[in-house]
A protein has these predicted regions:
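Intracellular terminal tails of multi-pass secondary transporters
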Residues: 51-86, 257-324
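Extracytoplasmic gate region of multi-pass secondary transporters
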Residues: 91-158, 211, 215-216, 229, ...
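Interfacial helix-cap and linker-helix signal at transmembrane-aqueous boundaries
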Residues: 4-8, 12-27, 128-129, 159-164, ...
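Paired intracellular helix-loop junctions of major facilitator superfamily
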Residues: 23-24, 28, 189, 217-229, ...
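Intracellular juxtamembrane helix-capping segments at the cytosolic ends
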Residues: 1, 9-11, 209-224
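Cytoplasmic loop-to-transmembrane helix junctions
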Residues: 31, 137, 227-234
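Cytoplasmic membrane-interface "Motif A"-like loop-to-helix N-cap segments
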Residues: 161-175, 193, 226
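C-terminal ends and interior cores of transmembrane alpha-helices
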Residues: 172-189
Length: 324
């Protein structure tokens, strides 16, 4: 489920690159405008289709029978929400910024990976252009790294869910992406084409993954649906703001090598990995402290979230997604 939130980022790079090449080869003078119009129209159509088809909740899911709806409700009260389909309260939602004290750390991690993510998704063609190929081949060469990135996105997301762990998964993958930026900053990729192109694969392998894992991480530790709604919208928005930073480091003044841009992306990526590990270690420490205080051995998921209405203030609360 979490992987579906970001797979579009990878696949969009594949489709748009192929679309641009096809239109350009068709000798259309406004190929850029056509590509953007077609991509935008497809996005709007799918969004409208989702609005019409997708149910508002599991209870309204027309494709589930009564038994399946009951199972869905059980899973949500067991592992997701303190109260399912609760009435929206703006005061309750805003209180998240006062009571959920870890949100600034989530935000900082989002800042760090956001610069890397938007640099890859927006400027990968400029990076690959350093290999020395023409426009058409450069666009085609962006397809393979994005496909590999999509595959790793699915695999790592499933792994993260299977092990119920977020911290190490985020840190490892963003580190891989950062190493790719270090390679690009340290070598002349027009003279070392294979190494440079491999570094582009490293960017896509690790660059897209932190986004869905981070969103899942703070949602896993926010059982109140009102607080979850406001935190999700706020943290996603603040992470997306980092697109402004990426657009101001990949500039004509730093072309064609973009060495400083690569160094900045790598630095923020490594910082995000350190913050992710720090948060993971804190959750491990706090869970162990709570177990010692109670003389029990509990982990996240042992206590139904329906019984944890006070969140981390509850004595039996255990953080989910930290280092095991």
């Amino acid at each position: 489920m979490e992987s579906s939130r970001s797979t579009h980022t990878c696949t969009d790079g594949n489709i748009s690159s192929l679309l641009k090449v096809c239109i350009r080869n068709g000798v259309t003078c406004c190929w850029k405008g056509c590509a953007n119009a077609l991509s935008g129209a497809a996005t709007f159509f799918v969004a409208l289709l989702g609005l019409l088809i997708l149910p508002k909740s599991a209870a309204d899911a027309y494709f589930l029978n009564e038994e399946e709806k009951a199972v869905a409700l059980y899973r949500m009260v067991q592992h997701s929400s303190s109260e399912v389909d609760s009435k929206f309260s703006i005061s309750q939602a805003i209180s998240a910024f006062k009571t959920d004290y870890l949100w600034p750390l989530y935000m900082l991690i989002g800042f760090c990976y956001g610069i890397t993510l938007f640099s890859i998704s927006n400027f990968l063609p400029l990076i690959i252009e350093r290999l020395g190929y023409g426009t058409v081949k450069t666009n085609l060469l962006t397809v393979a790294p994005n496909i590999v990135g999509s595959v790793f996105l699915m695999l790592v997301s499933f792994s993260s869910d299977f092990f119920r762990e977020r911290s190490i998964h985020i840190a490892v993958m963003v580190t891989i992406s950062s190493i790719g930026f270090v390679i690009l900053a340290c070598i002349n990729i027009s003279e070392h084409i294979a190494v440079g192109y491999f570094a582009c694969f490293m960017l896509c392998v690790g660059g897209f993954i932190p986004s869905p894992l981070l969103y899942s991480w703070f949602n896993n530790n926010t059982p109140d649906e009102n607080k979850r709604a406001i935190l999700t919208s706020f943290l996603v928005s603040t992470a997306n703001m980092m697109g402004i930073v990426s657009s101001n480091i990949f500039t004509p003044a730093t072309a064609p090598d973009y060495n400083m841009a690569s160094i900045i992306c790598a630095a923020f990526g490594f910082a995000g990995a350190v913050l992710s590990l720090a948060l993971g270690f804190y959750m491990k420490y706090d869970n162990a402290r709570r177990n010692r205080a109670q003389g029990v051995v509990l982990k996240a998921g042992d206590i139904p979230t329906s019984e944890l209405k006070n969140g981390w203030r509850h004595a039996e609360w255990r953080w989910m997604g930290g280092i095991p």
